[in-house]
Amino acid sequence: MRTDLLRARLLEALTLKELPRAGWVREGVQQPESVAAHSWGVAWLVLVLCPKHINREQALCIAIVHDLAELRVGDITPHDGVDPQDKAARELAAFSALNTGLPVDLMPFTQAYGNTPEGRFVKACDKLDMALQAQRYGAIQGLALQEFIDSALAKLEPGLLRELAAGASPPEL
């Protein structure tokens, strides 16, 4: 294994800490979360809310890497007008390149996102994280971010995650 390539990949992954979430920037959120903070939020939700029939370890791995490709392609949102198939192709190419030189193959985790029971659960937690963050920013900064909550609700099945995303009132902070 080439340590120079491994070091480069490890350092590049750390830049997720500096990449702000594009949707929050577009809406004028002050000090918006980074993509890395979002990924942590999704992993936190997976850890805490994982049902017994879901492999928690697999789901956590998927949550950690689910937005890694954004290092290279950026945080593409529906407002950017990028065709979903084009976005997926860009992200797959970026992830494949980022996977090179690592001592572990991360490709199965990115391929599982949305496509396995664990991947679908992580995708649901991704939507829940967005809704909860919208509630938080709305409460703290007085912003109208209902579109993010509505977007999450449109993709969440009835049950606990949907109830949490709907949030009857702003959370106490």
Residue ranges of predicted features:
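Active-site helical microenvironments for divalent-metal-assisted chemistry
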Residues: 1-173
